[in-house]
């Protein structure tokens, strides 16, 4: 929703999501291609803003933008990013490698991106009723940033490499913990047990879930975009 999603952030996020896919295989992204289809309702300055975000992400993660295409669209905006990465053959990590008695480990804070979206949607509704209102997003800064400007976990890949750790199976969380763990189980032909009391729940998650009357575990399991 471009009402609250700046095009610069959209370009940045589109790249980072694809870099994250490479990280999820224990690899490092080196190159990307970007193809954009855009309608005539977008000004040239809007495309500049979009590519500012794309280039910022490339600079942040030391990734080369090596090609792509720009064409017209009958309506709306379409962005397609392809990422190319490298990983040692012995360290490549697939969804299908999980073994019996493996420990399921989650990195980072789950559920914040979804709550950031809920906050932005709420403030949009307030704005539609009163266009003169100015939202105070400072108390929700981390959550909103998780939605608008996520970061790929290249730090985790570096940590694993530094400590000579190669996971048996790995995936990034796009659609919530429950969806992704099912992907791992199905690909590896294994089952798993998750303990809700062992899943980390950030204080900001608990606070905003209480504000929105949401169940923290449901947000973590089904929120996505973490």
Question: What are the language-model segments listed below?
Answer:
Residues 1-226:
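Helix-biased detector of long, well-ordered alpha-helical tracts
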